[in-house]
A protein has these predicted regions:
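A short, histidine- and acid-enriched strand-loop-helix "catalytic/donor-clamping" loop
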Residues: 49, 97-112, 127
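Membrane-proximal helix-turn-helix segments that form the acceptor-binding/catalytic region
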Residues: 65-69, 109-128
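Donor nucleotide-sugar binding/catalytic pocket of nucleotide-sugar-dependent glycosyltransferases
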Residues: 126-140, 145-164, 168, 173, ...
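Conserved donor-binding/catalytic core segment of Leloir-type glycosyltransferases
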Residues: 185-202, 207-221
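Nucleotide-activated donor-binding/catalytic signature segment of Leloir-type glycosyltransferases, i.e.
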Residues: 191, 222, 230-264
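Acidic donor-binding loop of glycosyltransferase active sites
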Residues: 264-279, 294
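Conserved acidic donor-binding segment of nucleotide-sugar-dependent glycosyltransferases
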Residues: 310-322, 329-337
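A short, well-ordered alpha-helix in the C-terminal region of glycosyltransferases
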Residues: 327, 331, 338-353, 362-365
């Protein structure tokens, strides 16, 4: 069996950096391991330049409909850009099944017309894969959600990629040149370091206020757009909060999973402070921290499929709770052995449930349902 794999990101860029050892495979949602599970892959040729949503949909439809390689189904990380093909499937004009990851719960539209259009559009999907059971449960409240089409997938990190990074750092730390040239900053020698990455729905004011009060060392990565005409709300929120000297703000531009993962691996704890959302904001950071064996402090998002407190791999904090964040940070800082146990437990969870190979196996099982 063979699938046409569609991604909203540039697939060729991802594959090229993967070949260079600088990109984790989980950003391709198990596609790299589908062949190991009996499903071959035709990779979508991403456009060389960013297009408008309509032009992207037209380009994608053209690529799919004119593909010279035979394929049996479409597997996609998102329906954005795939809309025209989905509509053709709903109309019965495209005969191949479509399997898509759905990042938010399906909801009923307040507009009767939009709801009717949505119900028709969703007929074009054969399976929708969700990141958690909570997303499925919330989706089932919407009339257009067909329970026969909804499944839960365990999306997780490329463990080999993070093991390689940890091995690189260990080798660098034991090399003679490292001991001769490296002098750790003073605050790193007296206190554990916390690190915050990611950009979606981040609650910077709560996080910064908590660390301003604790005085603990925080490395805060902020993604920015180099175009001065494009606003950078995350950076603006950070600057308004006036971070204290114990907070290092690092501006980054572009997709840098390898470079950031190296810095995360050096930290003692990963912190994920988010606003209330209807989806799994912060999940990418969660699965990477689990893979690296680091304890996690995270906003209590019921959409995320990891119960940090129950599983013993971290601490959950209510949304906007500055004092709760203070307590969690202090607990990790003053209980290093427990923090290490949390990290080790997180790695076990990654190996058991949240890894790219398991993700690929589950996706392959869904796709093979249409092989008969």
């Amino acid at each position: 069996m063979k699938v046409y794999f569609y991604h909203t990101q540039n697939i060729q860029y991802c594959l090229r950096r993967m070949a260079e050892g600088e990109f984790p495979s989980h950003f391709l949602y198990g596609a790299c391991h589908l062949a190991d599970n009996g499903v071959d892959v035709v990779y979508h040729r991403s456009p060389k330049h960013e297009l408008s949503r309509l032009k992207t949909a037209l380009y994608t439809a053209w690529r799919v409909l004119t593909c010279r390689e035979r394929f049996d189904a479409i597997y996609a990380t998102h329906y954005k850009g795939l809309e025209l093909v989905v509509l053709l499937r709903a109309l019965g004009l495209f005969r191949k099944p479509i399997v898509v990851w759905h990042h938010q719960p399906i909801v009923k539209s307040k507009s009767r017309l939009r709801e009717l259009l949505g119900r028709f559009f969703y007929k074009g999907f054969d399976r929708l894969i969700f990141f958690s059971q909570k997303l499925v449960d919330d989706s089932l409240k919407a009339p257009k959600a067909d329970p026969r089409k909804l499944v839960v997938g365990h999306w997780g990190a490329d463990l080999a990629f993070y093991d390689k990074i940890k091995a690189e750092l260990k080798a660098e730390q034991t090399s003679p040149s490292h001991h001769l040239t490296t002098t750790p900053p003073q605050h790193l020698t007296t206190s554990p370091s916390f690190i915050a990455t990611g950009k979606e729905q981040r609650d910077q004011p709560t996080l910064i206020e908590a660390f301003n009060r604790t005085g603990r060392h925080l490395i805060l990565y902020i993604g920015i757009n180099p175009n001065p005409n494009v606003p950078n709300p995350n950076l603006e929120a950070v600057e308004r909060c006036k971070p204290a000297d114990n907070i290092d703000v690092v501006k980054i531009c572009g997709l840098l999973p390898y470079e950031i993962a190296r810095e995360v691996a050096k930290a003692d704890c990963v912190v994920i402070c988010c606003h209330r959302t209807r989806y799994t904001a912060g999940l990418t950071t969660v699965v990477e921290a689990l893979a690296l064996g680091l304890p996690i402090i995270c906003s209590r998002n019921p959409q995320i499929p990891v119960d940090f407190d129950r599983l013993g791999c971290g601490i959950s904090v209510e949304y906007g709770d500055v004092e709760g964040w203070q307590r969690a940070v202090e607990y990790i800082s003053t209980h290093p052995e427990e923090a290490r146990r949390m990290g080790n437990r997180g790695r076990e969870i990654a190996e058991q449930m949240f890894n790219d190979e398991r993700c690929a196996k589950e996706v392959a099982e869904v796709i093979k349902e249409f092989s008969l």
